[in-house]
């Protein structure tokens, strides 16, 4: 039998051949690592067969590295995490990406970068070289750096002089990766530094309280992220842009695949709990004109939503087909005729105890035939599951990589595990496995009946769990 290394190599070769064949058939090119990112360069990631091939290549490459690398070298990828974060933040906040973009493809010397942003040239060179070792930026000659496909994501595409002169407005009106990177490398990073102390403290280690999250230890004057965002306009704007970036990882019509909306009768009521501005309600209201929708959130959010709906879909409001309602999800649910309660990216903000409180309010207001639809990340296990688990609950297992790869595709889905840890750091909350959702829902009087997965998000990012009254 071939060695695991040989099996991984064969999987990688087959995946590369598939990827190249698909791209040739579609007349598209694979990205050039040395060329700036463009939406067109990522066109292959809209083809299902290419996505799967890319996932196998990525998982196999890291798996092979784990086999052949000296253990200490491989482990330093994790131990060196703070160093990577520091290097990225230094370049991000000192506006290196904007300066490099303006210099053009031939690059710019760190001395000239330093003249523009006022920072130490030698320190900038060390950070840039560290990142270039991971293909983030490129060192084209000694101390001369230019962009790579990856480093472009830290660029706001504003003039460097503007962001240098107005750092508090740097992320205003941007829609890229720079704002979320800044948020995570600032607030989340500081909370992470005290995660172990929080976990090891008998007073907080087993707590489900929001005010016992690692964030609270890092920011004792605020205690919760929401308090910090209320007092800090820059952090608030940056956080809002981070949420926009997360939403952009899914297509607007993804909500149509979260549930079989076609089965609802005309006039059915759908209540989106914690619906914000109504991101999910807009496409539903457009596609299903006979559907009634209630979007619930806190009053200040609903006030902003009313302005948006008045601009985008005023007839839906004036006709009463869409209602925007101020509501606290921990209070008794006023809507008692819902065909569907929809919660998208809500439960991951809360620990199990608080999720049960939210879900019990919905259960008390539910009809016998009410469906509960939860859209959140589904954390895959790192072990392989058999067919019995899938047979017991359709969609429970999700996609599994071919052996000898880890069944969860290894680092391909690392984003979801990052999200899980970030929820812990900021909110003492979590992303959940299907089994964890099942347990929480049962405690609140709901029974999971199906899991709806799509290849978008690799079957783990923002997928749907459907439940009915138990």
From Swiss-Prot:
pH dependence: Optimum pH is 7.5.
Pfam family, one: Methyltransf_2
PROSITE patterns in alphabetical order: SAM_OMT_II
GO terms for MF: O-methyltransferase activity
Keywords tagged on the record: Lignin degradation, Methyltransferase, S-adenosyl-L-methionine, Transferase
Lyase keyword on record: no
InterPro entries cross-referenced by the UniProt entry: COMT-like, O_MeTrfase_dom, SAM-dependent_MTases_sf, WH-like_DNA-bd_sf, WH_DNA-bd_sf
SUPFAM superfamilies associated with the record: S-adenosyl-L-methionine-dependent methyltransferases, Winged helix' DNA-binding domain
Residues the record lists as binding S-adenosyl-L-methionine: 274-275, 297, 328-329, 344
Domain of life: Eukaryota
GO biological process, one term: methylation
Active site positions, chain numbering: 348
Catalytic activity, EC: 2.1.1.-
Record bears the keyword NADP: no
Family label: Belongs to the class I-like SAM-binding methyltransferase superfamily. Cation-independent O-methyltransferase family. COMT subfamily.
Physiological role: S-adenosyl-L-methionine-dependent methyltransferase that preferentially catalyzes the methylation of 4-OH phenolic compounds like coniferyl alcohol, vanillyl alcohol and ferrulic acid. May play a role in promoting lignin degradation by methylating and inactivating free-hydroxyl phenolic compounds, products of lignin cleavage which are known inhibitors of lignin peroxidases.
Protein name per the record: 4-O-methyltransferase 1
């Amino acid at each position: 039998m071939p060695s695991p290394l040989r099996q991984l190599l064969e999987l990688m070769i087959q995946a590369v051949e598939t990827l190249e064949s698909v791209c040739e058939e579609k007349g598209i090119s694979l990205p050039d690592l040395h060329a700036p990112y463009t939406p067109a360069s990522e066109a292959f990631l809209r083809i299902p067969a290419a996505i799967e091939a890319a996932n196998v290549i990525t998982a196999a490459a890291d798996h092979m590295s784990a086999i052949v690398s000296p253990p200490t070298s491989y482990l330093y990828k994790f131990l060196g995490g703070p160093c990577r974060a520091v290097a990225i933040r230094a370049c991000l906040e000192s506006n290196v990406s904007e300066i490099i973009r303006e210099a053009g493809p031939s690059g710019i010397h760190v001395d000239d970068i330093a003249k523009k942003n006022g920072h130490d040239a030698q320190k900038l060179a060390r950070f840039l070289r560290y990142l270039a070792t991971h293909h983030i930026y490129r060192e084209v000659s000694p101390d001369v750096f230019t962009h790579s496909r990856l480093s472009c994501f830290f660029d706001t595409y504003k003039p460097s002089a503007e962001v240098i002169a107005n750092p508090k407005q740097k992320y205003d009106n941007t829609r890229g990766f720079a704002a979320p990177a800044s948020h995570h490398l600032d607030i989340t990073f500081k909370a992470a530094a005290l995660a172990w102390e929080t976990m090891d403290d008998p007073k907080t280690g087993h707590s489900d309280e929001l005010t016992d999250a690692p964030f609270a230890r890092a920011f004792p004057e605020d205690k919760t992220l929401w308090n910090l965002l209320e007092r800090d306009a820059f952090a608030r704007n940056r956080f809002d842009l981070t949420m926009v970036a997360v939403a952009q990882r899914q297509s607007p019509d993804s909500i149509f695949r979260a549930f079989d909306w076609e089965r609802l009768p005309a006039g059915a009521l759908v209540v989106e709990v914690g619906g914000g501005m109504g991101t999910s309600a807009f496409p539903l209201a457009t596609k299903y004109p006979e559907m009634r929708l209630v979007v619930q959130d806190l009053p200040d959010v609903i006030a902003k939503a009313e302005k948006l709906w008045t601009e985008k879909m005023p007839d839906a409001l004036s006709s009463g087909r869409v209602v925007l309602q101020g509501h606290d999800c921990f209070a008794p649910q006023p809507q008692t005729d819902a065909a569907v309660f929809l919660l998208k990216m809500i439960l991951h903000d809360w620990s199990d105890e608080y999720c049960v409180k939210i879900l019990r309010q919905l259960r008390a207001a539910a009809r016998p035939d009410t469906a509960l639809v939860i859209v959140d990340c589904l954390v895959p296990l790192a072990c392989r599951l058999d067919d019995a688990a899938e047979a017991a609950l359709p969609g429970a297992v999700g996609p599994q990589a071919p052996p000898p790869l880890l069944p969860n595709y290894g680092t391909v889905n690392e984003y979801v595990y990052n999200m899980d840890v970030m929820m812990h750091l900021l909110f003492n909350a979590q992303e959940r496995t299907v089994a964890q959702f099942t347990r929480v829902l049962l405690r609140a009087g709901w029974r999971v009946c199906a899991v709806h997965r799509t290849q978008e998000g690799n079957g783990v990012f923002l997928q749907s769990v459907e439940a009915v009254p138990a």
